[in-house]
């Protein structure tokens, strides 16, 4: 996990539905892991 993810996750959680935020988290995790 990078600082970029830590910054984006709250934004997605507030700006989008939780289910969408989970999908984004999975994509970001795959990209870095």
UniProtKB/Swiss-Prot annotation:
One matching Pfam family: Amanitin
Cross-link (Cyclopeptide (Ile-Pro)): 11-18
Positions of crosslink type 2'-cysteinyl-6'-hydroxytryptophan sulfoxide (Trp-Cys): 12-16
GO MF annotations, alphabetized: toxin activity
Coiled coil: none
Keyword Transport assigned: no
Keywords carried by this UniProt record: Thioether bond, Toxin
Propeptide: 1-10, 19-33
Free-text description of this protein's post-translational modifications in UniProt: Processed by the macrocyclase-peptidase enzyme POPB to yield a toxic cyclic decapeptide. POPB first removes 10 residues from the N-terminus. Conformational trapping of the remaining peptide forces the enzyme to release this intermediate rather than proceed to macrocyclization. The enzyme rebinds the remaining peptide in a different conformation and catalyzes macrocyclization of the N-terminal 8 residues.
Domain of life: Eukaryota
Keyword hit for Transport: no
Note: The typical symptoms of amatoxin poisoning are gastro-intestinal distress beginning 6-12 hours after ingestion, a remission phase lasting 12-24 hours, and progressive loss of liver function culminating in death within 3-5 days. One of the few effective treatments is liver transplantation.
Function of the molecule: Toxin belonging to the bicyclic octapeptides amatoxins that acts by binding non-competitively to RNA polymerase II and greatly slowing the elongation of transcripts from target promoters.
UniProt record similarity statement: Belongs to the MSDIN fungal toxin family.
Protein name: Beta-amanitin proprotein
Protein species of origin: Amanita pallidorosea
């Amino acid at each position: 996990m990078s600082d970029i993810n830590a910054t984006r996750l709250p934004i997605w959680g507030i700006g989008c539905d939780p289910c969408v935020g989970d999908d984004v988290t999975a994509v970001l995790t795959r990209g870095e892991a």
